[in-house]
């Protein structure tokens, strides 16, 4: 894809993400597998522009939602994962699909070594919407730098 983003995102329930996922990234031994049934063929991710819509469509009002930030460069070059940009398919019969192409990961689970930042538990604002940190980087962090640079910690409401 031309102008591919440096990061891709996954919203997941806290139970899907080990508490030590950020620490385990240095070992290349633990991976994000996604949900059985939903992520059996590929793992669903979102771009920075799609995360808010994903949160509203599938996680509205939930208080145990984690944001995972994955570095595209590491997923492609070090984990050898295949990122395909495909149209959304409705999860339920009769449901309208979301617009645009979404990043789908083929080739196995995503090693936590591909994380660009520690997973974040998302808070809800007074309207019940998830509060997201600033998303999107110009350059993907390298694993040697630990993925901590480039994050100002700014928060945006969705």
Place the predicted regions along the sequence by residue.
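Conserved, structured core segments of small domains
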Residues: 2-158
């Amino acid at each position: 894809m031309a102008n591919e983003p440096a990061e891709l995102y996954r919203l997941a329930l806290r139970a899907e993400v080990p508490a030590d996922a950020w620490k385990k990234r240095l070992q290349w031994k633990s991976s994000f597998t996604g949900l059985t049934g939903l992520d059996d063929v590929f793992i669903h991710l979102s771009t920075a522009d799609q995360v808010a819509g994903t949160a509203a469509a599938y996680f509205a009002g939930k208080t145990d939602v984690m944001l995972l930030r994955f570095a595209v460069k590491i997923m492609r070059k070090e984990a050898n994962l295949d990122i395909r940009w495909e149209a959304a398919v409705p999860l339920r019969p009769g449901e309208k699909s979301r617009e645009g192409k979404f990043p789908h990961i083929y080739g196995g689970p995503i090693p936590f070594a591909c994380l660009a930042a520690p997973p974040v538990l998302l808070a809800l604002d007074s309207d019940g919407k998830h509060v997201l940190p600033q998303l999107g980087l110009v350059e993907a962090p390298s694993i040697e730098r630990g993925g901590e640079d480039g994050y100002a910690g700014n928060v945006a409401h969705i």
